[in-house]
């Protein structure tokens, strides 16, 4: 199984590069599926390897492909002066571009327990969480409750409001990035609550997924972003 996974990832990488090269020749900015810094099965038992592989290779790849296609169509429409098509493409760009942005953050927000996943945040982020939410447990409880309450599909976020210099918890619908809730918001931790993120393992019990995902949250990465942006 592991050999097949590696082979499929290499094949996928080759297809991504070929597609990107063709679009670059035409002078169009393109985006590619980022590699994961861990194996698909590395987050088990919190998130199954099957979910991670499908989520990454199928769902995220689809957002990247559709985003690039929409940008290519936008380029053509702008060159033709086709204003109606330019306007029509905005929803596809927002949805698929947002899907690419959000998932690129999500993969970094996760880490195997052997590499620090689930370890509590330290330093200034840990102190800020205690100040704003009382404790890490208080933050986890709040984010899990708000994530479980999302109607349909979306995301739950821990963000930094750079203008107000404070941490915030918010949700976004569908694939809207956190920045759509405010230009000064920087995502620190984003948790995908679309069914494709958990259904194969947790069925329709989203709260159980939200309970276990914290066991593989990469607080080290969140702390690095916080340190960089909170200045």
From Swiss-Prot:
Reactions that this protein is recorded to catalyse: 2 superoxide + 2 H(+) = H2O2 + O2
CC terms in the record's Gene Ontology section: cytosol; mitochondrial matrix; mitochondrion
GO molecular function, one term: superoxide dismutase activity
EC code(s) of this entry: 1.15.1.1
Induction of expression: Induced by salt stress.
SUBUNIT field: Homotetramer.
Protein name: Superoxide dismutase [Mn] 1, mitochondrial
Name of encoding gene: MSD1
């Amino acid at each position: 199984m592991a050999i097949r996974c590696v082979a499929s990832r290499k094949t996928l990488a080759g297809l991504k590069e070929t597609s990107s090269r063709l679009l670059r020749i035409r002078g169009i900015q393109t985006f590619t599926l980022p590699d994961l810094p861990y194996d698909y099965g590395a987050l088990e038992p919190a998130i199954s390897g099957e979910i991670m592989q499908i989520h990454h290779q199928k769902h995220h790849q689809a957002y990247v492909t559709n985003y690039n296609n929409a940008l290519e169509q936008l380029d053509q429409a702008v060159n033709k002066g086709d204003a109606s098509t330019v306007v029509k493409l905005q929803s596809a760009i927002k949805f698929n571009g947002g899907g690419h942005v959000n998932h690129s953050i999500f993969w970094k927000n996760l880490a195997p327990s052997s590499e620090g996943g689930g370890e509590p945040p330290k330093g200034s982020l840990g102190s800020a969480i205690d100040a704003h939410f009382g404790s890490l447990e208080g933050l986890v409880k709040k984010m899990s409750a708000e994530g479980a309450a999302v109607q349909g599909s979306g995301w739950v976020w821990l963000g930094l409001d750079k203008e107000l210099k404070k941490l915030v918890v918010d949700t976004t619908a569908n694939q809207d990035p956190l920045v759509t809730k405010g230009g000064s918001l920087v995502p620190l931790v984003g948790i995908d609550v679309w069914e494709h993120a958990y259904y194969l393992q947790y069925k329709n019990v989203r709260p159980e997924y939200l309970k276990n995902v914290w066991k593989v949250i990469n607080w080290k990465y969140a702390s690095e972003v916080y340190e960089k942006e909170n200045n």
